[in-house]
């Protein structure tokens, strides 16, 4: 969520979403070159900082000096928030969907546990063997949703692991995709799982929910 002069992936944007009734906030995480966690969608530096840089190559001190830009690429007063600051601000308020964090899951979970917020976290990732092993190792009790692209090739495997498998994000190009068929939806429903369709349209060339 963002609005007016408020950039996305900021505490100000999260507050807007909560005021509008949001139950879950999605955020992107990265680690600075010296190991501190921040909330920002890496790769979006030109749009959100008006700088052609790779923010993860900067120190935490340097990142704290940066200011986010609004939709017109005008600099705001808002900083790139640390993950610790975001956790403390949102404690007890809503569910936090941590995106782009599987490769830094160990420090991410250390921060979550430090703030005592395990029950507020939702982890998502691709269902690769490597990602699932990381979830099992560092976040076995955390609500987890794999991201299935067109078809589900991993549920049987996940069910045999020590993972709190509560549902899945499904991405499908056409209404004929296996993950959107009634038989599959009913099977997951009977197992008490939530299926989450991604209706965001980043590009008309890459439909995430059949259009």
Label each region the model flagged.
Residues 1-211:
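Phosphate-group recognition and catalysis centered on beta-loop-alpha active-site segments
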């Amino acid at each position: 969520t963002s609005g007016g002069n408020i950039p996305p992936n900021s505490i100000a944007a999260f507050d807007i979403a909560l005021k509008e009734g949001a139950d879950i906030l999605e955020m992107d995480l990265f680690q600075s070159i010296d190991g501190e966690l921040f909330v920002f969608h890496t790769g979006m530096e030109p749009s959100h900082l008006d700088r052609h840089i790779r923010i993860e190559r900067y120190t935490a001190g340097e990142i704290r000096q940066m200011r986010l830009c609004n939709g017109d690429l005008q600099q705001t007063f808002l900083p790139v928030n640390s993950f610790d600051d975001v956790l403390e601000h949102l404690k007890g308020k809503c569910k936090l969907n941590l995106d782009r964090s599987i490769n830094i899951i160990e420090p991410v979970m250390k921060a979550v546990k430090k703030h005592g917020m395990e029950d507020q976290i939702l982890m998502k990732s691709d269902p690769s063997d490597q990602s699932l092993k990381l979830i099992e190792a560092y976040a076995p009790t955390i609500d987890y949703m794999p991201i299935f692209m067109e078809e589900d090739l991993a549920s049987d495997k996940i069910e045999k692991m020590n993972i709190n498998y509560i549902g899945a994000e499904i991405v499908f190009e056409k209404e004929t995709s296996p993950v959107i068929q009634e038989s599959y939806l009913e099977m997951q429903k009977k197992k008490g799982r939530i299926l989450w369709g991604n209706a965001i349209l980043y590009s008309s060339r890459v439909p995430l929910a059949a259009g």
